[in-house]
Amino acid sequence: METIRNFSIIAHVDHGKSTISDRLIQICGGLSKREMHSQVLDSMDLEKERGITIKSQSVTIEYKSKCNKIIQMNFIDTPGHVDFSYEVSRSLSACEGALLIIDATQGVEAQTIANCHTALDMNLKVIPILNKIDLPTADPQRVKKEIEDIIGLSTNNIILCSAKTGTGITNLLETITHNIPYPKGNPNDPLQALIIDSWFDCYLGVVSLVRVKNGYLTKKTKIQIMSTKKIYNIEKIGIFTPKPIFKDILKCGEVGWIICGIRNITGAPVGDTITQHPNSAKKVLSGFKKIKPKIYAGLFTIQSNQFSLFRDALGKLSLNDASLFYEPEHSLALGHGFRCGFLGILHMEIVQARLEREYNLQIIATSPTVIYKIIMIDNTNYYLDTPHKLSTLQKIKEIREPIAKCLILLPIKYLGNTLLLCSQRRGVQNDISYYNNQILLDYSIPMSEVVLNFFDQLKSVSSGYASLEYNFELYKVAHVKCLDILVNYKKIDSLSTIVHKTKILNQAKNVVEKMKNLIPRHQFDIIIQAVIGTKVIVRTTIKQLRKNVLAKCYGGDVTRKKKLLKKQKIGKKRMKQIGNITIPQEVFLKILNNN
């Protein structure tokens, strides 16, 4: 165990985590020259297209140190976006150390602070690294001062490197060897292994990534999942280099994958403990806290005959993405679907894109909403994640909305525009700290304002230099209402939204105007209303198509024409009473996508 080092690579988005991973693999011979390519650990098409890491990837490599010791390094490349912070915390739970990568041109950013504090809270050894020192705009001295002032880390032994050119990577490997502690555990104790990640393979069943804390794992060992008490035989064991390599044993302190022929997607939950059977361990390992979704949205298939495939796809995806929550939901307009919980808008977009690409589904998503806390007159609490249900609740004492604690780091010259944006989003300033040319803003902003497009607008007003980190803070009394959309006096539940009183009129006008432009005309008037309770806020009418019943009358008495017009009037009146309004799926798609 003295020759094992387990560590994660953490950083803000685009600071060079994946490129440093490439250099470590290249120098240690994890892949041949023919197999090497840039961002080798970003295996998903979405990761390559967006240039971000979405899923943590584990790699085992061997490094021969300058003192001729062979060191086994198990490292995990983690995502940098705030929406995937749960992936980071899960990865850190399997490690004794963390490499904190900081871009020498951009300096400390909000997610750098958050990731570093997460690692320090878990008592990990954090090694700060300045990357991209080869660029002409790099300013190592300024960034060192930011690290000391903003994060509070010593920079006496900071590593200067360039992942692109390979400068400083050997020095980094030596620092990992000497500074990150080796894992603690007893190979003679009963087996305890933590499930870090799981995914479903069509041929092999559930594949689990595990960290062996005590004991060891061998092929054909009988194991027990401690939460379900179910017993399985280990069929295959291996590691990633990053390509899968089969092994006969996973020793104490090692990270690797196991296949046990589990066909049930809930058979090996992430965060669970694996032990042997018999001679089981008495205690479960402290896993990681189950994260709560920050936003909810309804997901529906455009083709109703795909529902069973959709249900299976969500199950397999949730195994690989433990932060995804879902439960069945029915909409009068969109049919059967699922109410899904996400960590943010990017997380929602990635899940939707993966469902469409990996499972060939056509998905429509309703407007995302946060979770509101409803206090009833009898002081009972009700948590609401579906907007249209608000109008059905009676005896409400007050409605509370979630507030996010936001840390915004930006250059001082963009302060004015950023303060204005935070004010427009109903933000309250808690603190402001100055660090040379950088400012750290501490704001409390309603979560509903943050999760939608706040980050995009923040980047816009700061020319891309501002960075954001946010977390749930508390629930606060809010003056919000449920805005319902009625078409010919029938409520369209999938278009209901919860809106703050100051924004109700604008929101109502926007939705009604879009619907008027998108819904096709019928042979009778269509009335579109935006209402709060029974009060109509905005109303418009899509005028009926006029069928010319007089086209065949070329003369004769005027009473003949009057008779035809009267008959048409009676028919239209009857049609309005019993006629169904056809709202194409494309209309919902355009309205909801715009929202």
Swiss-Prot record:
One of its GO terms (molecular function) is translation elongation factor activity. It comes from the Bacteria. Residues 2-184 form the tr-type G domain. One of its GO terms (cellular component) is plasma membrane. GTP binds at residues 14-19, 131-134. Its main location: membrane. It is a peripheral membrane protein. One of its GO terms (biological process) is positive regulation of translation. Gene3D superfamilies: 3.30.70.240, Elongation factor 4, C-terminal domain, Elongation Factor G (Translational Gtpase), domain 3, P-loop containing nucleotide triphosphate hydrolases, Translation factors. It catalyses: GTP + H2O = GDP + phosphate + H(+). It is found in: Cell membrane. InterPro entries: EF-4, EFG_III/V, EFG_V-like, EFTu-like_2, G_TR_CS, LepA_C_sf, LepA_CTD, LepA_IV. PROSITE patterns: G_TR_1 (PS00301), G_TR_2 (PS51722). Keywords: Cell membrane, GTP-binding, Hydrolase, Membrane, Nucleotide-binding, Protein biosynthesis. Pfam families: EFG_C, GTP_EFTU, GTP_EFTU_D2, LepA_C. CDD domains: EF4_II (cd03699), EF4_III (cd16260), LepA (cd01890), lepA_C (cd03709). Its EC number is 3.6.5.n1. Required for accurate and efficient protein synthesis under certain stress conditions. May act as a fidelity factor of the translation reaction, by catalyzing a one-codon backward translocation of tRNAs on improperly translocated ribosomes. Back-translocation proceeds from a post-translocation (POST) complex to a pre-translocation (PRE) complex, thus giving elongation factor G a second chance to translocate the tRNAs correctly. Binds to ribosomes in a GTP-dependent manner. Belongs to the TRAFAC class translation factor GTPase superfamily. Classic translation factor GTPase family. LepA subfamily. This is Elongation factor 4. It comes from Buchnera aphidicola subsp. Baizongia pistaciae (strain Bp). The gene is lepA.
